Amino acid sequence: MGNWSRSAVVLGVSLMLSGTAMGSQQGGAASGGQQKIDTATKTFSVKLGATRLIYNPESAGATLAVINPQGYPILVQSKVYAEDKQGNAPFVVTPPLFRLDGNQQSRVRVVRTGGTFAPDRETLYWMCVTGVPPKADDVWGQDKDGKSQAPKVATLEVQLRINSCIKLMVRPSSLKGDPADVATSMTWTREGSKLKASNPTPFFMNLKELSVGGKKVEGLEYVPPKGERTFTLPAGASGKVQWKVITDYGGDSREYQSALQ
């Protein structure tokens, strides 16, 4: 679940030749010379202005900053997914697709379109934003003079598109405070070689750190509200459980301690 927040997609391998490069290549072939073709791997991504969105279902929407760190324009695609990261969600993102110039920032707005949410706990969705690179013949990828801003040299290019996803937490207005305020309520139980985390609160507990007797627990995932999650105990682990959670602002909470039951 944590790894899904940034996933790479290989768009393809393309040979990009400008008119000048093509002419030089043809001329070189006639004279027995060879055109040098550069190879490059480019990663196209966007930076997001928050690590999570807290959405009040009674509000008019929530906004998120989107930054293009590349030096050329990209298309920005945005969509909200269900908790399983596959199904549709009762939200629309506006604009769903737009051009964002190089080294510029814009904002998208998430608006509820329907759905029924639990009144006594948070509901989780995923907000995903993807940057799409321009092709040589894309009109939207041209500068103000109508010139393409795609690479102008003969380049064998592998393009990697990065999906940037953050949690969208629907939090009813009846829930007050921050998950970090009640994270101490979590309990921990040994079940053989497993560690069961129980979360009696109405908030998702996004674990930042977890250890038992000073031994680090790997493979951390969130613990759902009024639910449980099981982790693998480190070999020989015993003693106190220590943990930290991620706050609403994306920072680390203080450290909590509890006895292992």
Language-model segment annotations:
Residues 10-19:
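Bacterial N-terminal signal peptides
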